[in-house]
Swiss-Prot record:
Lineage: Bacteria, Pseudomonadati, Campylobacterota, Epsilonproteobacteria, Campylobacterales
Gene Ontology terms describing biological process: translation
Cysteines paired by S-S bonds: none
PROSITE patterns (alphabetical): RIBOSOMAL_L17 (PS01167)
Keyword vocabulary terms for this entry: Ribonucleoprotein, Ribosomal protein
Organism: Campylobacter jejuni subsp. doylei (strain ATCC BAA-1458 / RM4099 / 269.97)
A GO molecular function held by the record: structural constituent of ribosome
Domain of life (superkingdom): Bacteria
Stored NCBIfam families: L17
Pfam hit, one: Ribosomal_L17
Protein name in the entry: Large ribosomal subunit protein bL17
InterPro entries: Ribosomal_bL17, Ribosomal_bL17_CS, Ribosomal_bL17_sf
SUPFAM superfamilies registered for this protein in UniProt: Prokaryotic ribosomal protein L17
Annotated GO CC locations: cytosolic large ribosomal subunit
Length: 117
């Protein structure tokens, strides 16, 4: 039973899941919009929104906290200096998920995840 289980395992070990979320976040920050499976998009939404909330402060400690999660200088700088300031007056809901199609090979539900304009 999965009573009160707080996250999706996505069929991966914890380290693989952490690496997956980190890589998806870097891709989302760099391109602004990515297509992935719906469960991955839903997990990514929570991960990214926590990072943006932290990055909104824009100070040195925010840079360090975001870099600790992403380990990528370019994505960290873009998130803290370009993306997060756009959401200065918004309390959460920085991303949106749009269901797109059913993938032909395995019938997985696909979705776009992007930043709210």
């Amino acid at each position: 039973m999965r009573h009160k289980h707080g996250y999706r395992k996505l069929g991966r070990t914890s380290s693989h899941r952490a690496a997956l979320l980190k890589n998806l976040t870097i891709a989302l920050v760099n391109s602004g919009k990515i297509e992935t499976t719906l469960p991955k998009a839903k997990e990514l939404r929570a991960y990214v929104e926590r990072l943006i909330t932290r990055a909104r402060l824009g100070d040195f400690n925010a840079h360090r906290a975001v870099f600790a999660s992403l380990q990528n200088k370019n994505a960290t700088n873009k998130l803290v200096t370009e993306i997060a300031p756009k959401f200065k007056d918004r309390n959460g809901g920085y991303t949106k998920i749009i269901k797109t199609r059913i993938r032909r090979g395995d019938a997985a539900e696909m979705a776009f995840i992007e930043f709210v304009a």
